[in-house]
Every structure is written in structure tokens, then in C-alpha cells.
């Protein structure tokens, strides 16, 4: 994906009637990585001395995951006050306007019912299963669009990098929560089963109905934001211990050394807001037949299909 495609996408989202969608400070990691990624330089150096282990270590060392939001990239660690100021649009809901939208929303609400029934207020364990599922769509969609680009021998329109960044980000969420809790054997088996089923179902769904697939992920992320908001409420109420944040989370989100689990929840929720907005926008692009992200879309072209509401997300 070309570097130029992403600023255009960010600007196109800002020009829509959705001011909460992808603010100028929440660009994908594929864009953020450009100024800091020295891979090209290192590759040239390795090519000159391919057998030097030191050169290979320098090259490999550059490939650390980067966060998807610009708030988490910088030289100054982020404190709790800064995390709380990140606008996530908690409670904002995309109103379904088509059969495809209603189908996606119905599936998500169906899954939410069983998640609530099984996990109740065990939010850390819920997060482990949630992030296992959430890491699948970006990888599946990115893989299918990658293969399509190769087969048709044409540019992908800028989707692949965004989708793979999403998958990587969700994977880091999972690894973080695995550090916080120790899932039981049953939960690990459940994760393996759910991931296997969801991968195959989503793979088929994306091949046949990509618009519905992206809309479904958008609604999944809406539910994720609600869950993480309830998670915060339980921590504030003293029902969930607010222990120290894992070192993995501190490094990934550039948090302060004394960061807590609550800070991690705030950071993860901000990421989920980004994924919500991106996937709803991807679905919109398919609806209006303007899938090339290198080309801007106007607010007028999206106005007929963008309907928003605010839902009550008070903890149960």
C-alpha cells in the first residue's frame, strides 16, 4: 500500500458527517510507522554484508508492533489523564439502514447475548475470548484482498495495510490480557473452538458478502466499547483489582512505568473505537462503490447511509 493513500483516507473520514470517526490523531499504524521504520536502510546494509549476524539482528530488531493511534507514539509516556481525554464516542451506534446492516447487527446481538450469559461480569476473561475473535477479521480480509490484488495484478486500493494493522493490534490486545489473567483449560478450549469456527465462517462471509462482513465487525467493536466501559466501571467500583499493567502493554502503548490495568483498558477501548470507525467506513465505501482509499469521498455521498444514535451503556 502506498504511503500517500492513508492521509487521503484520514481526510475522507474527517469530511464525513461522522465527526467521531477516525480523528486526525488516530491514523493506522501502517501510516505511523513510516518515519520510524528504518527497514529499507537496513535491508540495503544487509545486502552488502549478508553473512554478518550483527546486521541481521539490527534488521530483525526493527520489526516490533506499533500502535494504531498516534496518541501512543512519541517520546513522552502517556499518563492516565491523557488516556481519559481520548475521545472514543462511547455509546455511539450506527443505525442499520439496509437488510445487510440489520443482518450484521442481528448476528452481533445474538453473539452478545451468549457472551453476557457465559461471562457475566468476568471482564478480563471476556476480553480474552473477545480479542481472540477480534483478531480474525482483519487477517482474513487482508489475506483475501492480498490474493485478489495478486491475481488481478492491480493495486488493492489501500485496504491491505489497514486490515493487517487491525489484526496485529487485536493480537496485542489478546497477549496483554493473557498476561493479566490465567485462562482455565476450559476457556482455552473455548478460545480454540470459537476461533476455528469464526475464521471459517468469516472467510466464507467475506468472500460472498464483504460489506456485511465489515459492518458486522463495526458492530462487534461497538459492543467491545460497551464491554470495556463496563470493565472500567467495575474497576472503579473496586470489584476488579486494579493491578500493575503488564510490561508488554507499557511498551506497546507507551504508558508510564506505574501504569495500571485501568490504563490498559482505556488504551484498548481507544483502539476499539478506531476499528469500529474504520470498519463502518469500509462498509460504506463498498456501498457507494468507491473502494479505492486513495480517492477521497464527500460527505454528501455518505449522508444517505450514515445514521447515528446514542445508546445507554450504563453497567448492568
Swiss-Prot record:
Catalytic activity as recorded in UniProt: 2 a ubiquinol + O2 = 2 a ubiquinone + 2 H2O
Localization in the cell: Mitochondrion inner membrane
Membrane topology according to the record: Multi-pass membrane protein
InterPro entries in the cross-refs: AOX, AOX_sf
Transit peptide: 1-26
GO cellular component, one term: mitochondrion
Protein name: Ubiquinol oxidase, mitochondrial
Amino acid at each position: 500500500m502506498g504511503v500517500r493513500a492513508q492521509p487521503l483516507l484520514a481526510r475522507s473520514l474527517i469530511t464525513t458527517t461522522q465527526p467521531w470517526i477516525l480523528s486526525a490523531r488516530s491514523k493506522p499504524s501502517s501510516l505511523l510507522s513510516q518515519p520510524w521504520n528504518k527497514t529499507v536502510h537496513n535491508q540495503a546494509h544487509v545486502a552488502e554484508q549478508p553473512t554478518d549476524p550483527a546486521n541481521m539482528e539490527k534488521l530483525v530488531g526493527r520489526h516490533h508492533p506499533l500502535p494504531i493511534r498516534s496518541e501512543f507514539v512519541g517520546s513522552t509516556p502517556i499518563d492516565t489523564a491523557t488516556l481519559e481525554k481520548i475521545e472514543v464516542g462511547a455509546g455511539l451506534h450506527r443505525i442499520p439502514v439496509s437488510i445487510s446492516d440489520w443482518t450484521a447487527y442481528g448476528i452481533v446481538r445474538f453473539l452478545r447475548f451468549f457472551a453476557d450469559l457465559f461471562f457475566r461480569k468476568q471482564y478480563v476473561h471476556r476480553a480474552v475470548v473477545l480479542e481472540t475473535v477480534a483478531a480474525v477479521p482483519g487477517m482474513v480480509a487482508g489475506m483475501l484482498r492480498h490474493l485478489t490484488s495478486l491475481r488481478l495484478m492491480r493495486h488493492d486500493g489501500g485496504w491491505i495495510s489497514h486490515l493487517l494493522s487491525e489484526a496485529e493490534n487485536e493480537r496485542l490486545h489478546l497477549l496483554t490480557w493473557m498476561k493479566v489473567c490465567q485462562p482455565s483449560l476450559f476457556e482455552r478450549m473455548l478460545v480454540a473452538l470459537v476461533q476455528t469456527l469464526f475464521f471459517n465462517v468469516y472467510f466464507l462471509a467475506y468472500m460472498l458478502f464483504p460489506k456485511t462482513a465489515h459492518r458486522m465487525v463495526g458492530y462487534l467493536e461497538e459492543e467491545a466499547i460497551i464491554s470495556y466501559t463496563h470493565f472500567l466501571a467495575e474497576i472503579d467500583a473496586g470489584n476488579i483489582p486494579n493491578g500493575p499493567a503488564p510490561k508488554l502493554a507499557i511498551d506497546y502503548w507507551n504508558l508510564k512505568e506505574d501504569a495500571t490495568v485501568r490504563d490498559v483498558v482505556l488504551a484498548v477501548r481507544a483502539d476499539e473505537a478506531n476499528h469500529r470507525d474504520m470498519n463502518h467506513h469500509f462498509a460504506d465505501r463498498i456501498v457507494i462503490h468507491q473502494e479505492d482509499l486513495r480517492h477521497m469521498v464527500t460527505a454528501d455521498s455518505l449522508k444517505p447511509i450514515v445514521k447515528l444514535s446514542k445508546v445507554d451503556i450504563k453497567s448492568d
